[in-house]
Amino acid sequence: MHDNIFLPDAFLAQVQETMPSYLSMDEFIAACKRPLRRSIRVNILKNSVEEFKQRAAEKQWDLEPVPWCDTGFWITRPESDTVKLGSTAEHMAGLFYIQEASSMMPVTALLKDNDDIEMALDMASAPGSKTTQLAAGMKNQGALVANEFSSSRVKVLCSNIQRCGVSNVALTHFDGRVFGGWLPETFDSILLDAPCSGEGTIRKDPDAMHNWSPESVIEIGDTQRDLIESAFHALKLGGVMVYSTCTLNHEENQNICHHLVEQFGDAVTFEPLGDLFESAEKALTKEGFLHIYPQIFDSEGFFVAKIRKNSSTTPPEVKKRLGKFPFAPASNKEAQAIEAELKSTLQLAIPEDNEFWIRDKEVWAFPKRMKPLIGEMRYHRIGFKLAETHKKGYRWQHEAIMALATADNPTCAELNTEQAREWYMGRDVRPDFSGKGETIVTYKGAVIGLGKWVGNRIKNGLPRELVRDGNLF
């Protein structure tokens, strides 16, 4: 129990005023004091839910389904006191993502009756839980622009995208307010998981409310209004967007959605979410939003609204200052050479939805759907880095292997547990078998990296920033 949790009187008064009468304040406070259940989402870009369930059963992990996400589970592990969830082999290989159950709901809402997404925007995407969930829902097809304003969070976003084998994402690093003017009516689907006061995160962080005040709620509401307007301008006619927060007050939730109607009138339709999952009606508002208090589903507090754009809007006028784009499409000759080398050395091919782009000695695989947007905005990175050229051919990159390779590849070298631990510590390994050339390294049937045979050892190709120590699986 979080008996020392800080709940300001003004916050409790606000909850008392706005919480539906059928919910109890005593149950709300009791729920806030209970530690949050650990939850994960299976990464179906790497393994199916059934395959993961089999792995979990072998490790005696108990999985309880999350009702609103087919790939989400609350998890209980016998070794939780000795091995952190993030240090399990399955997590490090990208087979699952540690994600709070409530935060899976916005992407579920965005994907409902919306299977054929060609161009999506995740406007505030770090650390990447919803970006990777959306990419998986898109089956790595189309294009997904993942934006993050905070410089310190871009690196972890990039790392999570690579670990999960996502290949259809372009990263941007802007204040989300620029999208409405820079890319008007561009995206058929938009997720705005807005920065907020975080009232719903109390169970995860007992100190979450120490900096809370009614004034801070009003202040952040101004930012949210700007962001939702920008997102609506960037949304195509007929497109859908989801607005979500991990907070509980009406100022940052219902009022922000109603502001959109005040600005754009009949162009805005709220799509009801009462049938999103069984028992969703327990959190349903009169507008059709989901307002999740922590005691309803024993989860974090959350808010989710789904909005459709019925008519065009006039975006703000902007002047773009873009430098020269440093990449060029690979020529047919270059592309054929890259494809042939990738096939002959590693028995791999890039997906049909990607194409080669060149920057100096670097070879990248961009989502084809990004091509019309390349001259419209500045990007932190697009797609994944496939290789670096050198005089003897190509030096394939770790992130490309994580995006492309599967454990049934004929070049794979399967490690035992001790060797896999050595691998993640950045050390070369000496299996009791031999090989030659570059090899895809696997552990328990999951791809974990790229190595190269040097004599009777495999030279470790793990990027330095991924090297781990401590108690691993």
UniProtKB/Swiss-Prot annotation:
Tell me which species this is from. Aliivibrio fischeri (strain ATCC 700601 / ES114) (Vibrio fischeri)
Residues annotated to bind S-adenosyl-L-methionine:
A124, S125, A126, P127, G128, S129, K130, E148, D175, D193
Its subcellular locations are: Cytoplasm
EC number per UniProt: 2.1.1.178
Recorded GO cellular component terms are: cytoplasm
Family matches, as InterPro entries:
Methyltr_RsmF_N, MeTrfase_RsmB-F_NOP2_cat, MeTrfase_RsmB-F_NOP2_dom, Nol1_Nop2_Fmu_2, Nop2p, RCMT, rRNA_ssu_MeTfrase_F, SAM-dependent_MTases_sf
Q: Which residues form the active site?
A: C246
Q: What is its biological role? A: Specifically methylates the cytosine at position 1407 (m5C1407) of 16S rRNA.
Q: Coiled coil located at which positions?
A: none
The alphabetized list of GO BP terms reads: rRNA base methylation
Pfam families per record: Methyltr_RsmB-F, Methyltr_RsmF_N, Methyltranf_PUA, YebU_pre-PUA_dom
| GO molecular-function term, one example from the UniProt record | RNA binding
- Protein's UniProt keywords contain S-adenosyl-L-methionine: yes
> Top EC class per UniProt?
transferase
Catalyzed reactions per annotation: cytidine(1407) in 16S rRNA + S-adenosyl-L-methionine = 5-methylcytidine(1407) in 16S rRNA + S-adenosyl-L-homocysteine + H(+)
- The name under which this protein is listed is Ribosomal RNA small subunit methyltransferase F
Q: Keyword Ribonucleoprotein on this protein?
A: no
As for family, the record states: Belongs to the class I-like SAM-binding methyltransferase superfamily. RsmB/NOP family.
Q: What keywords tag this UniProt record?
A: Cytoplasm, Methyltransferase, RNA-binding, rRNA processing, S-adenosyl-L-methionine, Transferase
